[in-house]
Amino acid sequence: MKNQPKVICSVNSLIIFNGLCFFVVHFFLWFNCFFANAQDNIHVSDRQILGPCGDTLLLKGINYSPYNWGWSPNQLKFDEIAKTEANCVRIVWYKTGGAGSPASVYSNLSNLDSALSRCVKKGMIPIIELHDQTCQNSPSNLIALANWFSQTGVKLLIDKYKYSLILNLANEALHVNWTGNPSASRIIFQSTYNTIVQNLRSSGIEVPLMIDAPDCGTNLEALSIVGPGLLSNDPLHNLIFSAHAYWYSYAGNDSTQMAIHIGSALAANIPFVFGEVANLQDDVSLCQYALNFKPLLRICKNQKIGWLAWSWDNDVCAARQISSNGNFSSLTSYGQEMVFNSEFGLSSNPAIKSRFLRNGNCDITSNVRISHSTDLKIIPNPCHGSFSVLGLKDGETPVVFNLLGEHIKIENSGQNNQFHISGSAIPGVFWVQMGEHRQKFFVVSGIL
Protein backbone atom coordinates (compact mmCIF):
# COMPACT_ATOMS: atom_id res chain seq x y z
CA MET A 1 0.00 0.00 0.00
CA LYS A 2 1.30 3.44 -0.93
CA ASN A 3 2.39 5.53 2.09
CA GLN A 4 0.05 8.44 2.78
CA PRO A 5 1.13 11.94 3.84
CA LYS A 6 0.85 12.66 7.53
CA VAL A 7 -1.72 15.06 8.93
CA ILE A 8 0.07 18.28 9.86
CA CYS A 9 -2.75 20.60 10.98
CA SER A 10 -2.64 21.04 14.73
CA VAL A 11 -6.33 21.95 15.14
CA ASN A 12 -7.72 18.88 13.39
CA SER A 13 -9.71 21.09 11.03
CA LEU A 14 -7.71 20.24 7.92
CA ILE A 15 -6.61 16.89 6.57
CA ILE A 16 -4.01 16.77 3.79
CA PHE A 17 -4.41 13.69 1.68
CA ASN A 18 -2.58 13.12 -1.58
CA GLY A 19 -2.06 16.86 -1.98
CA LEU A 20 -5.76 17.70 -1.66
CA CYS A 21 -7.31 19.74 1.18
CA PHE A 22 -10.45 18.45 2.86
CA PHE A 23 -12.01 20.79 5.42
CA VAL A 24 -13.57 18.94 8.36
CA VAL A 25 -15.18 21.26 10.84
CA HIS A 26 -15.25 19.90 14.38
CA PHE A 27 -17.77 22.12 16.11
CA PHE A 28 -16.51 21.87 19.66
CA LEU A 29 -12.88 22.24 18.68
CA TRP A 30 -13.64 25.37 16.69
CA PHE A 31 -15.88 26.74 19.40
CA ASN A 32 -13.27 26.31 22.14
CA CYS A 33 -10.41 27.52 19.96
CA PHE A 34 -12.09 30.56 18.53
CA PHE A 35 -14.44 31.80 21.20
CA ALA A 36 -12.15 31.36 24.20
CA ASN A 37 -10.77 34.88 23.75
CA ALA A 38 -13.94 36.54 22.46
CA GLN A 39 -15.30 39.44 24.51
CA ASP A 40 -18.40 41.58 24.39
CA ASN A 41 -16.56 44.74 23.45
CA ILE A 42 -13.45 46.31 22.01
CA HIS A 43 -10.56 46.05 24.48
CA VAL A 44 -6.85 46.77 24.75
CA SER A 45 -3.70 44.77 25.36
CA ASP A 46 -0.52 46.79 25.84
CA ARG A 47 -0.43 49.11 22.80
CA GLN A 48 -2.90 47.09 20.79
CA ILE A 49 -6.59 47.77 20.36
CA LEU A 50 -8.49 44.52 19.86
CA GLY A 51 -11.96 43.85 18.54
CA PRO A 52 -14.45 41.66 20.41
CA CYS A 53 -13.26 38.75 18.26
CA GLY A 54 -9.64 39.33 19.31
CA ASP A 55 -8.60 40.84 15.98
CA THR A 56 -6.11 43.70 16.08
CA LEU A 57 -7.65 47.04 15.10
CA LEU A 58 -5.66 49.90 13.63
CA LEU A 59 -8.10 52.79 13.87
CA LYS A 60 -8.04 54.90 10.70
CA GLY A 61 -10.99 57.16 10.17
CA ILE A 62 -12.64 60.54 10.05
CA ASN A 63 -14.19 63.02 12.45
CA TYR A 64 -17.77 63.90 11.67
CA SER A 65 -20.49 66.02 13.24
CA PRO A 66 -23.77 64.39 12.23
CA TYR A 67 -26.80 66.55 11.56
CA ASN A 68 -24.48 69.47 10.64
CA TRP A 69 -23.70 70.33 14.26
CA GLY A 70 -27.41 70.04 15.04
CA TRP A 71 -28.58 72.49 12.39
CA SER A 72 -29.76 69.91 9.83
CA PRO A 73 -31.87 67.31 11.70
CA ASN A 74 -32.11 64.94 8.73
CA GLN A 75 -28.54 65.06 7.46
CA LEU A 76 -26.38 61.96 7.92
CA LYS A 77 -23.38 61.25 5.69
CA PHE A 78 -22.08 57.89 6.91
CA ASP A 79 -22.74 56.27 3.52
CA GLU A 80 -20.45 58.84 1.90
CA ILE A 81 -17.77 58.56 4.60
CA ALA A 82 -17.67 54.77 4.16
CA LYS A 83 -16.51 55.25 0.58
CA THR A 84 -13.15 56.44 1.93
CA GLU A 85 -12.64 52.94 3.44
CA ALA A 86 -12.34 54.42 6.94
CA ASN A 87 -12.86 51.80 9.64
CA CYS A 88 -14.05 54.24 12.32
CA VAL A 89 -15.81 57.58 12.72
CA ARG A 90 -15.39 59.94 15.66
CA ILE A 91 -18.86 61.35 16.18
CA VAL A 92 -19.18 64.85 17.61
CA TRP A 93 -22.00 65.05 20.16
CA TYR A 94 -23.18 67.43 22.88
CA LYS A 95 -24.80 66.89 26.24
CA THR A 96 -26.37 70.31 25.83
CA GLY A 97 -26.69 71.82 22.37
CA GLY A 98 -27.17 75.50 21.71
CA ALA A 99 -30.55 77.14 21.41
CA GLY A 100 -32.96 76.15 18.66
CA SER A 101 -32.33 73.17 16.41
CA PRO A 102 -29.06 71.94 18.02
CA ALA A 103 -30.71 71.77 21.45
CA SER A 104 -33.53 69.58 20.16
CA VAL A 105 -31.26 67.39 18.02
CA TYR A 106 -28.78 66.55 20.79
CA SER A 107 -31.41 66.05 23.48
CA ASN A 108 -33.20 63.43 21.36
CA LEU A 109 -31.26 60.19 21.82
CA SER A 110 -33.06 58.58 18.88
CA ASN A 111 -30.91 60.85 16.71
CA LEU A 112 -27.78 59.43 18.29
CA ASP A 113 -29.18 55.92 17.83
CA SER A 114 -29.71 56.61 14.12
CA ALA A 115 -26.17 57.91 13.73
CA LEU A 116 -24.67 54.89 15.50
CA SER A 117 -26.82 52.50 13.48
CA ARG A 118 -25.77 54.03 10.14
CA CYS A 119 -22.14 53.96 11.19
CA VAL A 120 -21.99 50.29 12.20
CA LYS A 121 -24.05 49.18 9.20
CA LYS A 122 -21.26 50.56 7.05
CA GLY A 123 -18.70 48.54 8.99
CA MET A 124 -17.23 51.51 10.84
CA ILE A 125 -16.59 51.72 14.59
CA PRO A 126 -18.38 54.72 16.14
CA ILE A 127 -16.44 56.79 18.67
CA ILE A 128 -18.82 59.08 20.57
CA GLU A 129 -17.14 62.24 21.85
CA LEU A 130 -18.71 64.96 23.98
CA HIS A 131 -17.77 68.44 22.74
CA ASP A 132 -19.19 70.59 25.57
CA GLN A 133 -15.93 71.10 27.49
CA THR A 134 -13.63 71.68 24.51
CA CYS A 135 -10.42 73.39 25.69
CA GLN A 136 -11.99 74.20 29.07
CA ASN A 137 -10.21 73.70 32.39
CA SER A 138 -12.84 72.78 34.96
CA PRO A 139 -12.44 69.34 36.60
CA SER A 140 -15.84 69.55 38.29
CA ASN A 141 -17.62 70.46 35.05
CA LEU A 142 -15.79 67.67 33.25
CA ILE A 143 -16.88 65.09 35.83
CA ALA A 144 -20.46 66.30 35.56
CA LEU A 145 -20.31 66.14 31.76
CA ALA A 146 -19.00 62.56 31.73
CA ASN A 147 -21.91 61.44 33.92
CA TRP A 148 -24.04 61.90 30.79
CA PHE A 149 -22.80 58.50 29.64
CA SER A 150 -24.29 56.78 32.70
CA GLN A 151 -27.85 58.06 32.31
CA THR A 152 -30.37 55.34 31.50
CA GLY A 153 -31.11 56.24 27.88
CA VAL A 154 -27.46 56.56 26.94
CA LYS A 155 -26.54 53.31 28.72
CA LEU A 156 -29.19 51.50 26.69
CA LEU A 157 -27.48 52.71 23.52
CA ILE A 158 -24.06 51.74 24.85
CA ASP A 159 -25.34 48.24 25.55
CA LYS A 160 -26.99 48.05 22.13
CA TYR A 161 -23.74 48.85 20.31
CA LYS A 162 -21.26 47.54 22.89
CA TYR A 163 -19.53 45.19 20.45
CA SER A 164 -18.36 48.09 18.30
CA LEU A 165 -18.36 51.24 20.43
CA ILE A 166 -15.72 53.52 21.95
CA LEU A 167 -16.60 56.40 24.29
CA ASN A 168 -14.39 59.49 23.95
CA LEU A 169 -15.17 61.06 27.31
CA ALA A 170 -14.60 64.70 26.41
CA ASN A 171 -13.02 66.68 23.63
CA GLU A 172 -9.70 68.34 24.50
CA ALA A 173 -10.55 69.10 28.14
CA LEU A 174 -8.29 70.35 30.96
CA HIS A 175 -4.96 72.17 30.94
CA VAL A 176 -1.51 71.00 32.04
CA ASN A 177 1.36 72.91 30.45
CA TRP A 178 -0.88 75.92 29.94
CA THR A 179 -1.35 76.39 33.69
CA GLY A 180 2.32 77.21 34.23
CA ASN A 181 2.60 74.35 36.75
CA PRO A 182 2.64 71.13 34.71
CA SER A 183 3.54 68.80 37.60
CA ALA A 184 0.61 69.86 39.76
CA SER A 185 -1.77 70.01 36.81
CA ARG A 186 -0.90 66.50 35.68
CA ILE A 187 -1.95 65.24 39.12
CA ILE A 188 -5.27 67.04 38.77
CA PHE A 189 -5.71 65.68 35.23
CA GLN A 190 -5.06 62.11 36.37
CA SER A 191 -7.23 62.42 39.48
CA THR A 192 -10.13 63.86 37.49
CA TYR A 193 -10.08 61.09 34.92
CA ASN A 194 -9.62 58.45 37.63
CA THR A 195 -12.87 59.70 39.15
CA ILE A 196 -14.67 59.67 35.80
CA VAL A 197 -13.49 56.17 34.93
CA GLN A 198 -14.48 54.80 38.35
CA ASN A 199 -17.91 56.44 38.07
CA LEU A 200 -18.59 54.94 34.65
CA ARG A 201 -17.29 51.49 35.54
CA SER A 202 -19.43 51.52 38.69
CA SER A 203 -22.46 52.22 36.51
CA GLY A 204 -21.76 49.06 34.51
CA ILE A 205 -20.11 50.55 31.41
CA GLU A 206 -17.46 48.15 30.09
CA VAL A 207 -16.65 49.50 26.63
CA PRO A 208 -13.29 51.24 26.08
CA LEU A 209 -13.03 54.82 27.29
CA MET A 210 -10.94 57.22 25.24
CA ILE A 211 -9.16 60.08 27.03
CA ASP A 212 -8.02 63.17 25.13
CA ALA A 213 -4.73 64.86 25.89
CA PRO A 214 -4.87 68.16 27.82
CA ASP A 215 -4.07 71.61 26.41
CA CYS A 216 -6.71 71.42 23.68
CA GLY A 217 -5.71 67.86 22.94
CA THR A 218 -2.11 68.60 21.97
CA ASN A 219 -0.12 67.42 24.99
CA LEU A 220 0.88 63.86 24.14
CA GLU A 221 3.70 64.02 26.70
CA ALA A 222 1.19 64.35 29.53
CA LEU A 223 -0.61 61.22 28.33
CA SER A 224 2.71 59.37 28.20
CA ILE A 225 3.30 60.23 31.86
CA VAL A 226 -0.17 59.66 33.36
CA GLY A 227 -1.46 57.01 30.94
CA PRO A 228 0.06 53.94 32.64
CA GLY A 229 -1.38 54.99 36.01
CA LEU A 230 -4.82 55.64 34.55
CA LEU A 231 -4.81 52.23 32.87
CA SER A 232 -3.75 50.54 36.09
CA ASN A 233 -6.52 52.23 38.07
CA ASP A 234 -9.25 51.31 35.58
CA PRO A 235 -10.88 48.14 36.98
CA LEU A 236 -11.15 46.82 33.41
CA HIS A 237 -7.81 48.21 32.17
CA ASN A 238 -9.63 49.28 29.02
CA LEU A 239 -8.58 52.81 28.12
CA ILE A 240 -7.42 54.37 24.86
CA PHE A 241 -5.55 57.67 24.77
CA SER A 242 -5.84 60.30 22.08
CA ALA A 243 -3.75 63.31 21.10
CA HIS A 244 -4.75 65.95 18.57
CA ALA A 245 -1.95 66.92 16.21
CA TYR A 246 -2.37 70.69 16.14
CA TRP A 247 1.35 70.82 16.70
CA TYR A 248 2.38 74.10 15.10
CA SER A 249 3.67 75.23 18.50
CA TYR A 250 3.72 72.02 20.56
CA ALA A 251 6.17 70.29 18.19
CA GLY A 252 7.28 73.38 16.32
CA ASN A 253 5.66 71.92 13.19
CA ASP A 254 8.88 69.89 12.97
CA SER A 255 8.94 66.20 12.07
CA THR A 256 11.93 65.48 14.32
CA GLN A 257 10.12 66.88 17.35
CA MET A 258 7.01 64.96 16.35
CA ALA A 259 9.01 61.74 16.33
CA ILE A 260 10.41 62.49 19.79
CA HIS A 261 6.96 63.08 21.31
CA ILE A 262 5.59 59.96 19.63
CA GLY A 263 8.59 57.95 20.79
CA SER A 264 7.82 58.86 24.41
CA ALA A 265 4.27 57.59 24.04
CA LEU A 266 5.48 54.39 22.42
CA ALA A 267 7.93 53.86 25.27
CA ALA A 268 5.06 54.22 27.76
CA ASN A 269 3.43 51.22 26.05
CA ILE A 270 -0.04 52.72 26.14
CA PRO A 271 -2.72 52.32 23.47
CA PHE A 272 -2.99 55.70 21.77
CA VAL A 273 -4.19 57.26 18.54
CA PHE A 274 -4.21 60.67 16.97
CA GLY A 275 -7.89 61.49 17.33
CA GLU A 276 -7.58 64.57 15.14
CA VAL A 277 -5.11 65.20 12.33
CA ALA A 278 -5.57 68.22 10.08
CA ASN A 279 -3.89 70.41 7.51
CA LEU A 280 -4.63 73.76 9.14
CA GLN A 281 -4.67 75.11 12.69
CA ASP A 282 -6.67 78.03 14.06
CA ASP A 283 -5.30 80.71 16.34
CA VAL A 284 -6.23 84.37 16.32
CA SER A 285 -7.84 83.72 12.95
CA LEU A 286 -9.27 80.61 11.32
CA CYS A 287 -7.00 78.43 9.15
CA GLN A 288 -4.04 80.48 10.41
CA TYR A 289 -1.22 77.91 10.34
CA ALA A 290 -0.39 75.28 7.72
CA LEU A 291 0.38 72.03 9.54
CA ASN A 292 3.15 69.64 8.57
CA PHE A 293 0.85 66.63 8.72
CA LYS A 294 2.38 64.37 6.06
CA PRO A 295 5.52 63.43 8.02
CA LEU A 296 3.30 62.76 11.03
CA LEU A 297 1.16 60.32 9.08
CA ARG A 298 4.26 58.61 7.70
CA ILE A 299 5.41 58.05 11.28
CA CYS A 300 1.95 56.72 12.13
CA LYS A 301 2.15 54.26 9.26
CA ASN A 302 5.62 53.05 10.22
CA GLN A 303 4.72 52.69 13.91
CA LYS A 304 1.21 51.31 13.34
CA ILE A 305 -0.49 54.22 15.11
CA GLY A 306 -4.12 54.97 14.34
CA TRP A 307 -5.38 58.38 13.28
CA LEU A 308 -8.57 60.20 12.34
CA ALA A 309 -8.76 63.15 9.96
CA TRP A 310 -10.54 66.33 10.94
CA SER A 311 -13.14 66.83 9.53
CA TRP A 312 -15.62 65.45 7.03
CA ASP A 313 -17.65 68.60 6.32
CA ASN A 314 -19.18 71.77 7.79
CA ASP A 315 -16.01 72.99 9.50
CA VAL A 316 -15.46 76.65 10.40
CA CYS A 317 -12.34 76.39 8.22
CA ALA A 318 -13.62 75.24 4.82
CA ALA A 319 -10.12 74.29 3.62
CA ARG A 320 -9.92 71.83 6.53
CA GLN A 321 -12.86 69.77 5.26
CA ILE A 322 -12.42 66.37 3.64
CA SER A 323 -15.48 66.99 1.47
CA SER A 324 -16.73 70.37 0.32
CA ASN A 325 -20.39 69.34 0.57
CA GLY A 326 -20.45 66.04 2.47
CA ASN A 327 -20.32 63.84 -0.62
CA PHE A 328 -17.44 61.55 -1.53
CA SER A 329 -17.56 62.85 -5.10
CA SER A 330 -16.62 66.33 -3.84
CA LEU A 331 -13.37 65.75 -1.96
CA THR A 332 -11.28 68.86 -1.39
CA SER A 333 -7.57 68.89 -2.26
CA TYR A 334 -6.92 68.15 1.42
CA GLY A 335 -9.50 65.36 1.28
CA GLN A 336 -7.85 63.86 -1.78
CA GLU A 337 -4.58 63.75 0.16
CA MET A 338 -6.07 62.08 3.22
CA VAL A 339 -7.96 59.50 1.18
CA PHE A 340 -5.67 58.72 -1.75
CA ASN A 341 -2.11 59.55 -0.71
CA SER A 342 -0.07 56.53 -1.80
CA GLU A 343 1.83 56.36 1.50
CA PHE A 344 -0.89 56.78 4.12
CA GLY A 345 -4.29 57.45 2.51
CA LEU A 346 -7.43 55.88 3.93
CA SER A 347 -8.31 54.27 0.62
CA SER A 348 -4.84 53.57 -0.75
CA ASN A 349 -3.71 52.04 2.57
CA PRO A 350 -6.97 50.79 4.11
CA ALA A 351 -7.06 49.46 7.64
CA ILE A 352 -8.84 46.16 8.16
CA LYS A 353 -12.33 46.61 9.55
CA SER A 354 -13.56 44.98 12.73
CA ARG A 355 -14.20 41.29 12.17
CA PHE A 356 -17.38 41.54 14.21
CA LEU A 357 -18.70 44.34 11.98
CA ARG A 358 -17.69 42.47 8.84
CA ASN A 359 -19.46 39.27 9.83
CA GLY A 360 -21.98 40.16 12.52
CA ASN A 361 -20.39 37.68 14.92
CA CYS A 362 -17.09 36.06 15.84
CA ASP A 363 -17.74 32.73 14.14
CA ILE A 364 -14.60 31.84 12.23
CA THR A 365 -16.63 29.90 9.68
CA SER A 366 -18.28 33.12 8.52
CA ASN A 367 -14.86 34.33 7.41
CA VAL A 368 -14.07 31.21 5.43
CA ARG A 369 -15.83 30.97 2.11
CA ILE A 370 -15.25 27.35 1.11
CA SER A 371 -15.52 27.89 -2.62
CA HIS A 372 -12.63 27.72 -4.99
CA SER A 373 -12.11 29.76 -8.14
CA THR A 374 -11.32 27.53 -11.08
CA ASP A 375 -9.13 30.19 -12.70
CA LEU A 376 -6.74 30.46 -9.72
CA LYS A 377 -4.13 27.88 -8.87
CA ILE A 378 -1.50 27.79 -6.10
CA ILE A 379 1.72 25.90 -6.87
CA PRO A 380 2.90 24.03 -4.88
CA ASN A 381 0.03 23.40 -2.50
CA PRO A 382 0.96 22.59 0.28
CA CYS A 383 4.08 24.73 0.22
CA HIS A 384 6.89 25.73 2.57
CA GLY A 385 6.23 29.49 2.38
CA SER A 386 7.06 30.23 -1.24
CA PHE A 387 4.36 29.79 -3.86
CA SER A 388 3.20 30.88 -7.29
CA VAL A 389 -0.28 32.10 -8.17
CA LEU A 390 -1.45 31.08 -11.61
CA GLY A 391 -4.44 32.80 -13.16
CA LEU A 392 -3.71 36.38 -12.08
CA LYS A 393 -4.95 39.03 -14.46
CA ASP A 394 -2.72 41.84 -15.66
CA GLY A 395 -1.85 44.20 -12.82
CA GLU A 396 -3.42 42.02 -10.12
CA THR A 397 -1.63 41.44 -6.82
CA PRO A 398 -2.88 38.63 -4.57
CA VAL A 399 -4.20 39.48 -1.12
CA VAL A 400 -3.69 36.74 1.47
CA PHE A 401 -5.71 36.10 4.66
CA ASN A 402 -5.49 33.50 7.39
CA LEU A 403 -8.53 31.62 8.70
CA LEU A 404 -9.22 34.39 11.21
CA GLY A 405 -9.68 36.84 8.38
CA GLU A 406 -6.47 38.70 9.22
CA HIS A 407 -4.48 40.14 6.37
CA ILE A 408 -1.12 38.39 5.95
CA LYS A 409 1.79 40.26 4.43
CA ILE A 410 3.46 38.60 1.46
CA GLU A 411 6.54 39.56 -0.50
CA ASN A 412 7.17 39.27 -4.21
CA SER A 413 10.14 36.98 -4.78
CA GLY A 414 11.26 39.09 -7.73
CA GLN A 415 9.76 36.79 -10.34
CA ASN A 416 6.35 37.07 -11.93
CA ASN A 417 3.54 35.77 -9.75
CA GLN A 418 5.89 34.21 -7.19
CA PHE A 419 5.44 35.19 -3.55
CA HIS A 420 6.63 34.36 -0.04
CA ILE A 421 4.97 34.38 3.40
CA SER A 422 7.21 35.28 6.33
CA GLY A 423 8.05 32.60 8.87
CA SER A 424 6.19 34.37 11.69
CA ALA A 425 2.85 33.62 10.00
CA ILE A 426 3.39 29.93 9.35
CA PRO A 427 2.51 27.11 9.57
CA GLY A 428 -1.13 27.63 8.76
CA VAL A 429 -4.01 27.60 6.33
CA PHE A 430 -4.49 30.66 4.13
CA TRP A 431 -6.46 31.85 1.19
CA VAL A 432 -5.66 34.09 -1.73
CA GLN A 433 -8.43 36.61 -2.36
CA MET A 434 -8.81 38.39 -5.69
CA GLY A 435 -11.83 40.67 -5.66
CA GLU A 436 -15.06 39.58 -4.02
CA HIS A 437 -15.65 36.24 -5.69
CA ARG A 438 -12.25 34.77 -6.60
CA GLN A 439 -10.36 32.88 -3.91
CA LYS A 440 -8.21 29.81 -3.42
CA PHE A 441 -7.15 28.05 -0.21
CA PHE A 442 -3.62 26.81 0.34
CA VAL A 443 -1.50 25.34 3.13
CA VAL A 444 1.90 26.46 4.36
CA SER A 445 3.85 23.99 6.47
CA GLY A 446 5.00 21.08 4.31
CA ILE A 447 4.34 17.37 3.85
CA LEU A 448 6.31 15.05 6.08
Predicted regions and their residues:
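N-terminal secretory signal peptides that target proteins for export/translocation
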Residues: 1-18
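Bacterial N-terminal signal peptides
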Residues: 18-33
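Low-complexity, Pro/Thr/Ser/Gly/Ala-rich linker/spacer regions in secreted
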Residues: 36-39, 358-374
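N-terminal carbohydrate-binding accessory modules
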Residues: 37-88, 102
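Extracellular glycoside hydrolase catalytic/binding regions
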Residues: 41-42, 66, 70-71, 143-151, ...
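Aromatic-lined substrate-binding rim segments of carbohydrate-active enzymes
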Residues: 74-135, 144-147, 197-203, 292-301
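C-terminal outer-membrane/trafficking sorting elements
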Residues: 371-448
